[in-house]
């Protein structure tokens, strides 16, 4: 056993001291000689040798098998000899295999080198093609270049030769040379312009002279103004006699004498405010003056109506007695009767939109009602969600907190309604108008809430103290609703309008997009699970308007609902959010959703923009898109899932998470452009 292993083990041959190579070096020499031999040998001959060797091996194997099957003792030497021959053939096959591998390696190397050369030539070709394209563009620019003289409108060639002197036109040269012809035409243009410049100077001097004459005549006319004023003062009796049109203000004051006390106070105070502070405020009196003059006595009390009805029962007439229902209808009409005259206030905003308020006085109820008419300065686009923004019955609701104009402000009216079967004044508001509390204040009326007050006194001081504030609130309400109407038209098309002044509040690239903006009902808002906190805090009322929005990015969908107070933008909108991405997330189960709500609900003052802050809503929605980007890009990626990130991080964040709640950096820092925690 040990002798066989010693025979099989390859002896270690080292280089001798006289410089002869050992066995290892001989093997290396053989390897390299085989590489050189590949270049000399023919692969086809090697292939034929391979086939012959295989055939010889098959023949030797079959002969050995035949000899062994015979079992003759004399055949042992022959079998051993054939084994030796087979080993020689195996050695030949191994050598052929080595040569084939060397050829394969060389073929691969040659292919790789050829591929590299082809790639280099291809790259060089692309560079040359790019240079050719660049040169072609430059050539095109040069060919399309227009000289400055081409923009000058020169006279025609016929006029040039007919008007220009021969020293400039040079017909013997320019008629055959287009270049010289153009130069000569330009010289003639220059000569003409010099002449026109001289004429211009002469005209300016003449203009100055005429202006001086005009100033002298103006001074003369100004000296006539005092004389004309005295003549106008002396002609006042004649104007009254002839009823000249410019005396209409005097007529209006005459008509004001027939106004009831609240409307008269309103007219006087509004006229005074118009003259002193707002000359665009137009105050007018409308209605039937003759009917107003006929009202020489106050309306009869309800007790008198009862006595009259008793007297009618005692009369013996042949006409049919009216039914109880008809009597109640007549009493209701009498109770809700308006004064024949009314006062209209026309408020004009800077952009040209007008808000016309018509004030009526209900004589038996002793209250003022208002009807509204809106005239925008521009054509409004159709927006479904903006349907109620400019509704005359809703636009002035809650101008002051809690004043929706649906109930009467006079406590005495409740007892009057009970007698004639009127359940609520809201059933007649469309016909009579809204009895807002601020309307009573503008008319000098004040009704205490603790006890009925059948008698009223119109106070001028009360009206004057509230006039300016109310007028400003009315204008602000109209402007805010018009601004919201334009914003809603853009939001319904998925576009968030952001002004230039507010673009610094957001990064240049916001990927999340608004895909839905609709109006929803108050009941639908209450049914949403993620609006519970807002409802419990009393921030959602029936007088508010409610909208839903959807912001998407990839598979993430951010649903939100908005509470829009009538007093927008003094009272900011309130947002409630719910994110549908890998489950449903709201402020109740994800602290970062609560932080996103705080960014738009608590820090809204950063988004108001330039006064009066009508862009607050759109800026809040744009911030929500930005916050959704930060939320998704800072979310931890699942490393077990192969492939690229769905939301690759593109925002610069100083710190991704902070605190035990693991809040994300939602605050945008301008102009540095990074996000941080608050």
Curated annotation (Swiss-Prot):
Residues 301-314 have a biased composition (Acidic residues). GO terms for cellular component: cytoplasm; nuclear speck; THO complex part of transcription export complex. GO terms for biological process: cell differentiation; mRNA export from nucleus; mRNA processing; RNA splicing. Keywords: Cytoplasm, Differentiation, mRNA processing, mRNA splicing, mRNA transport, Nucleus, RNA-binding, Transport. Residues 14-37 have a biased composition (Basic and acidic residues). Residues 1-37, 294-329 are annotated as: Disordered. Pfam families: FmiP_Thoc5. InterPro entries: THO_Thoc5. A motif (Nuclear localization signal) lies at residues 7-10. GO terms for molecular function: mRNA binding. Component of the THO subcomplex, which is composed of thoc1, thoc2, thoc3, thoc5, thoc6 and thoc7. Component of the transcription/export (TREX) complex at least composed of alyref/thoc4, ddx39b, sarnp/cip29, chtop and the THO subcomplex. Interacts with thoc7. Belongs to the THOC5 family. This is THO complex subunit 5 homolog B. The lineage of its organism: Eukaryota, Metazoa, Chordata, Craniata, Vertebrata.
């Amino acid at each position: 056993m040990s002798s066989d292993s010693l025979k099989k083990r390859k002896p270690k041959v080292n280089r001798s001291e006289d410089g002869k190579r050992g066995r290892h070096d001989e093997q290396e020499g053989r390897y390299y000689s085989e590489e050189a031999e590949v270049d000399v040998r023919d692969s086809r001959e090697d292939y034929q040798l391979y086939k012959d060797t295989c055939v010889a091996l098959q023949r030797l194997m079959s002969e050995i098998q035949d000899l062994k099957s015979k079992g003759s003792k004399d055949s042992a030497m022959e079998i051993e000899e054939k084994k030796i021959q087979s080993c020689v053939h195996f050695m030949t096959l191994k050598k052929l295999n080595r040569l084939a591998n060397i050829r394969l390696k060389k073929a691969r190397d040659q292919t790789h080198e050829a591929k590299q050369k082809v790639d280099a030539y291809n790259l060089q070709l692309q560079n040359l093609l790019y240079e050719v394209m660049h040169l072609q563009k430059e050539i095109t620019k040069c060919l399309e270049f227009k000289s400055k003289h081409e923009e000058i409108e020169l006279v025609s060639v016929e006029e040039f030769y007919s008007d220009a002197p021969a020293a400039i036109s040079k017909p013997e040269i320019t008629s055959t040379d287009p270049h010289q012809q153009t130069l000569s035409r330009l010289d003639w243009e220059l000569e003409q312009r010099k002449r026109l410049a001289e004429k211009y100077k002469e005209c300016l001097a003449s203009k100055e002279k005429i202006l001086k004459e005009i100033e002298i005549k103006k001074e003369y006319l100004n000296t006539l103004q005092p004389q004309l004023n005295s003549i106008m003062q002396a002609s006042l009796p004649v104007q009254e006699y002839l009823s000249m049109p410019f005396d209409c203000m005097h007529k209006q004051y005459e008509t004001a004498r027939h106004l009831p006390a609240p409307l008269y106070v309103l007219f006087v105070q509004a006229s005074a405010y118009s003259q002193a502070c707002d000359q665009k405020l137009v105050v007018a009196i409308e209605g039937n003056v003759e009917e107003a003059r006929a009202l020489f006595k106050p309306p009869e009390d309800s007790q008198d109506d009862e006595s009259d009805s008793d007297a009618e029962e005692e009369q013996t007439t042949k006409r049919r007695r009216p039914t109880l229902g008809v009597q109640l209808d007549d009493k209701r009409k009498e109770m809700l009767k308006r004064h024949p005259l009314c006062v209209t206030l026309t408020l004009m905003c800077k952009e040209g939109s007008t808000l016309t308020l018509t004030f009526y006085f209900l004589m038996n109820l002793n209250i003022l009602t208002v009807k509204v008419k809106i005239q925008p300065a521009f054509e409004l686009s159709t927006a479904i969600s903006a349907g109620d923004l400019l509704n005359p019955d809703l636009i002035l609701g809650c101008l002051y907190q809690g004043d929706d104009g649906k109930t009467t402000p006079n406590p005495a009216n409740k007892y009057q309604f009970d007698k004639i079967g009127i359940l609520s004044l809201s059933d007649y508001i469309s016909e009579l108008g809204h009895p807002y509390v601020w309307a009573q204040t503008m008319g000098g009326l004040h009704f205490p809430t603790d006890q009925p007050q059948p008698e009223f006194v119109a106070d001028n001081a009360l009206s004057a103290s509230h006039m300016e504030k109310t007028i400003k609130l009315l204008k602000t309400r109209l402007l805010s609703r018009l601004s919201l109407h334009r914003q809603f038209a853009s939001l319904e098309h998925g576009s968030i309008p952001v002004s230039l002044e507010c673009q610094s509040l957001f990064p240049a690239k916001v990927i999340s997009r608004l895909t839905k903006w609709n109006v929803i009902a108050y009941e639908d808002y209450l049914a949403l699970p993620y609006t519970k906190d807002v409802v419990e805090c009393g921030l959602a009322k029936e007088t508010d308007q409610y909208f839903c929005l959807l912001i998407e990015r990839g598979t993430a969908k951010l649903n939100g609902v908005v509470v829009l107070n009538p007093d927008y933008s003094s009272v900011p909108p309130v947002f409630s959010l719910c994110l549908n991405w890998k489950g449903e997330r709201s402020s109740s189960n994800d602290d970062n959703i609560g932080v996103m709500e705080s960014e738009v609900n608590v820090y809204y003052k950063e988004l108001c923009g330039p006064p009066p802050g009508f862009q607050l809503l759109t800026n809040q929605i744009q911030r929500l898109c930005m916050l959704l980007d930060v939320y998704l890009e800072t979310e931890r990626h699942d490393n077990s899932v192969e492939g690229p990130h769905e939301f690759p991080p593109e925002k610069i964040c100083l710190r991704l998470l902070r605190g035990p709640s693991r809040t994300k950096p939602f605050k945008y820092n301008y102009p540095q452009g990074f996000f941080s925690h608050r």
